[in-house]
Amino acid sequence: MKYTKCNFMMSVLGIIIYVTDLVADIVLSVRYFHDGQYVLGVLTLSFVLCGTLIVHCFSYSWLKADLEKAGQENERYFLLLHCLQGGVFTRYWFALRTGYHVVFKHSDRKSNFMEEQTDPHKEAIDMATDLSMLRLFETYLEGCPQLILQLYAFLECGQANLSQCMVIMVSCCAISWSTVDYQIALRKSLPDKNLLRGLWPKLMYLFYKLLTLLSWMLSVVLLLFVDVRVALLLLLFLWITGFIWAFINHTQFCNSVSMEFLYRIVVGFILVFTFFNIKGQNTKCPMSCYYTVRVLGTLGILTVFWIYPLSIFNSDYFIPISATIVLALLLGIIFLGVYYGNFHPNRNVEPQLDETDGKAPQRDCRIRYFLMD
């Protein structure tokens, strides 16, 4: 494994998107409060706080486990940083500093911030991988709900202010970036996995995820116009289903029972929006079932909206949005098939043992038990 300049630049771009997303959300929430739209302001701020709190819980949990593994006991300092919501920024500082020394200074430094002897390339890759997992959490816990909320607010009033447009654009960029960056980090940190080489595999994967996600979020927005309670009940049902699926698969990502429970809650929430392999096993059947349900759900929502009185919604937007939903879903499924049929790194690899059963030569790394593609 080798940490490259490309990996370093991806980390730099990652923190730029992270900070921009955070600032845009705060500015928009202030704008809502200033305009007297208190419900939208509270919801916008709540999504930000909820996402960052959960992300920092996982960040501190991982750091605590790493410190205990290294025999260190200086965790109170890091606990304070995470309580002040500075854990992610601290991780970025160490990751960028380490990455800079590795790729530009060609440092042979062998100790990290835990005073542990380690290979600098491995250290830089592990730090970047932890950040990619945290960004993935933040994207689906905060970015996706935020995007649905802002699209709903935009369609309800028929126009968007600059802050709203900024949040929508940054959320789309954050979702796109974190999705691709996570796949690159996943395969970079696990030597037994084939790398995602070239531009086309990354583009196919990005379009598959982004288009299916866009189609579903627009469908949810339409359902919110029909009946907010029905939309929330549907999302709750899907979350519970994903939560139960995580329990059935006996995920083993966290060391503590409480954090594993929280992890399964988050996995259930992520599965509301997109599919991930939560146990590293063959996913052909689960993925087929998932997107079959997604297609049926999307068509059902469009059917309900067509027969519902259009007085609740600006009809000028309905036909373009309906066409966008159908086209995005169709193209997303096509890109899914193209990616797994022609560009997936494991498409020509002989079937092997389950990646999480520990019977094959593997490097001990927490991402091995995280969400796969």
Curated annotation (Swiss-Prot):
One of its GO terms (biological process) is apoptotic process. InterPro entries: XK-rel, XK-related_scramblase. The chain crosses the membrane at residues 8-28, 38-58, 166-186, 206-226, 230-250, 256-276, 295-315, 318-338. It comes from the Eukaryota. Pfam families: XK-related (PF09815). Belongs to the XK family. This is XK-related protein 9. The lineage of its organism: Eukaryota, Metazoa, Chordata, Craniata, Vertebrata.
